Design a protein with these regions (language model features):
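N-terminal small-residue-enriched
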Residues: 1-147
């Protein structure tokens, strides 16, 4: 982390981590979090004509340089005319991080830290991480898989 901080001319942040003592520390994420908004989740859902409500995620990958990502939706629901209808599972959400953040149009007030066990994989290492965020409406993402 100190080497990267010096290279980029910024203060070290303590993000140099490694999965075992045998490996060299490398800069990586620890926790990813989004602040809560001021809307109720139900009010956001009511604005959606057709969409996917993603309840649980697993197995994500990010191409760091490009920001492209894919996340596997373990469980969720189809949104039709502002209501949660059919359950969906085994679908992928595909997008680009900076673009997806720019496409967030509404953020709910139901922030929470995920209770799952997440892992950040980088350069052959795996370190535990956590994430948290409120419900958010992203206007455009690619959805694929089976219902």
């Amino acid at each position: 982390d100190r080497i990267s901080a010096k290279h980029y001319g910024v203060a070290p942040t303590g993000n140099g981590r490694r999965d075992t003592f045998r490996n060299t520390p490398i800069p990586r994420m620890r926790a990813t979090y989004m602040e809560a908004g001021n809307m109720k989740e139900a009010d956001i859902i009511s604005t959606v004509k057709k969409g996917i409500y993603c309840d649980q995620f697993t197995n994500g990958q990010v191409q760091i340089g490009a920001g492209d990502f894919t996340f596997f939706v373990k469980s969720g629901y189809l949104i039709e005319d502002g209501k949660l209808t059919q359950p969906v599972k085994y679908i992928n959400i595909i997008g680009n991080g900076p673009k997806a953040l720019a496409d967030i149009t509404m953020v709910a007030n139901n922030d929470k830290i995920d209770n799952g066990t997440w892992t950040c994989g980088k350069d052959g290492q795996s370190c535990p991480v956590t994430c948290g965020m409120p419900s958010a409406l992203v206007s455009k993402l690619t959805v694929g898989g089976e219902s």
